[in-house]
Amino acid sequence: AEFFGGGLTIRATVDPDLQAAAAAALREGLEKFDRAGGVWRGTGKVIAADRLGEGAGWRAALAEVAVPRDIAGWHPAVVLATTGKAARIGIEGVEDDPDGHFIPAEDVSWARKRLADGKLGAKAKGAGDLVEVGDVVLVRAITNDDGSFKRWSLRQVPEVQGAFMAMDVNSGRVLAMQGGFSYQDSVFNRTTQATRQPGSSFKPFVYAAALDSGFSPATIIIDAPIEVNTPQGMWRPKNASNKFYGPAPMRTGIEQSRNLMTVRIAQEIGMDTVAIYAERFGVYDPMNPFLANALGAQETTLFKMVAAYSMFANGGERVEPTLVDRVQDRYGKTIYRHDQRVCEDCQLASLGAGFAPRIVSRRERVMDAITAYQLTSMLQGVVQRGTGRGIHLPVPFAGKTGTTNDSKDVWFIGYTSNIAAGCYIGHDQPRPMPHASGAGMCGPVFQAFMQAAVAKYGGGKFRVPPGGHFINVDRFTGSPLVDGSSGDNVVAEYFRDGEEPTFGMLVDGGFGMGSNLPLFAYGEVGSDEGDATVITGTGETKVIPGKANFGTLSSGGLY
């Protein structure tokens, strides 16, 4: 009774601008994939010919048809006639034009209609090849660069679905949540309800457990074939490239999403340890300690994954996502507030120039602050030169791609210093998505949303916790370099004070590495551009052998 009749004021966390940005970004990504498939399905709804009369006739009939009306810029319409290669349409909410509204031939050349025998017909040469009189369709206006009207365009709700979520990494406030292409088309919230394999986007939790178990980003891991005898038969995980690259630093393993390195790390530290971390971060409850789950085989939700990544971003403190910021009673008294952090200086009348209020947190620490920074640095490498290198933002950010077997599910989850966001795309009934990858499909969705988020909320450098120091390391070999070294292969790794790194130690997970294997030097992505050089702090030039070439994105996943 108090809830419904007590005059309570409930403040939601969702930012309307960012919610609109999330919906637009996800819809654009889903529609791009759907249209690339080139199959016209339409709405499947038809209005009888006797209800297509001029004036209010077709409008009344169209208003009764159940089609999505919550997609920004889209309008329900009905085909009134097909003339030549164009189709004349009546559009809900748009006044009649004396010359008529038309779908021109140029708008349908991307599509083919599925024939009665299940085969695809030829590419449409005119609108009449796709639609018939009485068909209910969805349309949107295409504009010129100056915003002027160009033409009406046929649209359809994609078969592929997805979800997107963004949250404040410090307060837990959910800033945006999009559970699918259209709520009116499907009320299923894929952010919270769809349990899917996260694939390689789970790997950071394996690496986090390793970093807390004595590993460093420069620890050398063997990338070579593995065979595991299981009750279901022999399991032979593979890299996405179907190649293996020999000894490489742990940083390379996550930047290039190496499955074999990840499995060896998980075997070395123990899957029980990995499970403890996954459960501590709320990804699973419980996690089954099987090696395949180190590659993201066990299902979870996007909601849980974004919440877990938020704890990487905030330095390792527990944060719970919420859609309710606070609740006030009828007198304006706050009776519930989600964010329990304390502002030490908010009662002061003023602060000195350059000072900000101190926010004190007493939250549980789920991860060592130095481990969180090391992992963030490695995930920055993913977007700088790894599987997510096609994503660009004007502020520092980190993230991880995920692509499962046969590209049935694709992910990208990333974060700036203040906002974490994640994208998932896949069919509700899992099936392969040809040529799909987390970077290629979810990457652009993440980028489009985060550009809007950064424009509104900004972003800065990730905070370096006290208690450590930087050492320049050759990211190809894991070898230490002198201070002042420069070059494409130089990376500054952060190590704990008093725990000097051990360089040159090989980790194989107990699997070993066979002899006479066709290994690729340093396992880098890209063309063989010849030798690379490094200028050391003493002015010496060190030659690094050319990179191996193994083609396009290595998104990792379940192989």
Residue ranges and their predicted role:
Residues 3-196, 200-202, 208, 215-219, ...:
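Periplasmic/cell-envelope proteins involved in peptidoglycan metabolism and beta-lactam response
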Residues 6-14, 123-129, 157, 164, ...:
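Active-site loop and adjoining helix of the penicillin-binding protein/serine DD-peptidase-beta-lactamase fold
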Residues 14-15, 280-346, 354, 360, ...:
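Active-site-proximal helix/loop microenvironment
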Residues 16-31, 85, 170-173, 204-212, ...:
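Active-site-proximal alpha-helical segments within enzyme catalytic domains
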Residues 35, 216-223, 287, 318-323, ...:
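Acidic/polar loop patches that form or flank catalytic/metal-binding clefts of enzymes
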Residues 48-57, 81-85, 92-95, 133, ...:
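Soluble, non-transmembrane domains of envelope/secretory-pathway proteins that act on or interact
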Residues 166-181, 211-215, 226, 246, ...:
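Glycine-rich, acidic and aromatic/proline-enriched surface loops and short helix-turn segments
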Residues 170, 215-274, 318, 330-373, ...:
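Conserved catalytic neighborhood of penicillin-recognizing serine enzymes
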